[in-house]
Amino acid sequence: MKKMVLATVLASLFFSSVAMSEDKTAFSLPAIEKSAEEGNAASQYQLGVKYEGGEGVEQNIQKALEWYTKAAEQGHAEAQLNLALMYDMNDDIERDAEKAVYWYNKAAVQGLSLAQYNLAVSFDEGDGVEQDHEKAVYWYTKAGEQGDSDAQYNLAISYDEGIGIEQDHEKAVTWYTKAAEQGHADAQYNLAVSYDEGEGVERDGSKAVFWYTKAANQGNRDAQNNLGVMYDEGDGVAKDQRKANEWYKKAALQGNGLAQNNLAINYYYGKGVKRNLKEAYAWFAVAVENGEGDEAMLKRTARALNAAQLAEAKLLAASYIAKYLDD
């Protein structure tokens, strides 16, 4: 069973970290502007936030960039992160991956977990910096130790596949677990596969079912298919082919070819559902189009239908192919 791949870069903004005092006039826009002009880094950062979000002022991305830069150059960590995010993914300015990496690094060194995570992804992908999987692992670890679930997940992938660090399936399971317990769907799925296959941990069908269910309930189609298999075979859970079909159907509707084929088989044999050869044909057909179908079973199903039924089945198959091909 395949596992999920690396997570993508997250975008997030840090807002004011300046404590409010009883003198609220000190935090009025004119007061912030005056303080910023006098060189106060926290005020410069505040002004950058206001201009970026159009908070109490007309939105002005260029001014936001200027004020973040002033604060960042004075060592303000949140300003450094926001500046990096602007260079990395703000549609209103020209993207500059190298500058993004420069400022992510500044903020990461100061301990901001999002900066550490995004810096790790930059090293992993060679985006704005020479690709370096070892450095990616270093920064995933830093962010993961602070509880960043995406970093924990990517660190687990690194251990699982031996990318940038010696392969260690047990450590992969440790980090998948940390991310999974925070609700990370892909980590839940990969942890389930680890329990299912006994990789890095003793095989445990019931724990595999537990984590497949967690991921499946979040819409992970691979987990939905695998959970269907567990119910179909009574592995780690009481055998229930009706529930198996429910999970196959959820995954099939999301374009999972294996689930489409599994659902077709159950329609063909009437397992957990009333036998329906037209449905079987249609699901076999879309599964074949997705590269996961049993072509022999598709032909076998076609032979079991009369001409009129086959014509209807082909129309149904065409509609399924239009809707449920894998993206």
State where each predicted segment sits.
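Terminal, low-structured helical/coil segments at or just beyond the last alpha-helical repeat
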Residues: L6, L10, K24-F27, E289-D327
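Short helix-capping/linker turns of helical repeat alpha-solenoids
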Residues: E37-N40, G53-E55, N60, E73-H76, ...
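TPR/TPR-like alpha-solenoid signature
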Residues: Y45, E66, L81, Y102, ...
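Hydrophobic face of amphipathic alpha-helices that form TPR/SEL1-like repeat modules
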Residues: Q46-G53, N82-M89, N118-E125, N154-E161, ...
